């Protein structure tokens, strides 16, 4: 099991975070504070994301946050899933 941070909680980030969690990894999912409503929606579901396609299941994400330091704390692997047009905001 690896401790993994997924940065950007859009469709791709959520799918990746869920897949990794279902595979037994310890996953933190982060997005920018301006996307707090997305983060809060996942939190209201008990930090769960449901996958329904080739991979199915309900994954529990250990940490869902808008705090980048918290998401990266102890991460062995970091995935950055923001689309190219949205990446600049992560570096401002």
Predicted stretch roles:
Residues 79-80, 84-92:
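Rossmann-like NAD(P)(H) cofactor-binding subdomain of soluble oxidoreductases
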Residues 54-55, 60-74:
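Short acidic low-complexity segments
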Residues 2, 61, 77:
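Short, flexible active-site loop motifs that bind/organize anionic cofactors or intermediates
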């Amino acid at each position: 099991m690896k401790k993994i941070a997924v940065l950007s909680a859009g469709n791709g980030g959520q799918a990746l975070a869920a897949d990794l969690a279902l595979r037994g990894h310890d996953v933190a999912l982060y997005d920018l504070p301006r996307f707090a409503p997305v983060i809060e929606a996942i939190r209201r579901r008990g930090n769960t994301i449901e996958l329904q396609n080739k991979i199915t299941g309900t994954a529990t994400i250990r940490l869902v946050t808008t705090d980048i330091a918290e998401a990266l704390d102890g991460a062995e692997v970091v995935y950055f899933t923001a689309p190219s047009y949205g990446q600049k905001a992560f570096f401002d």
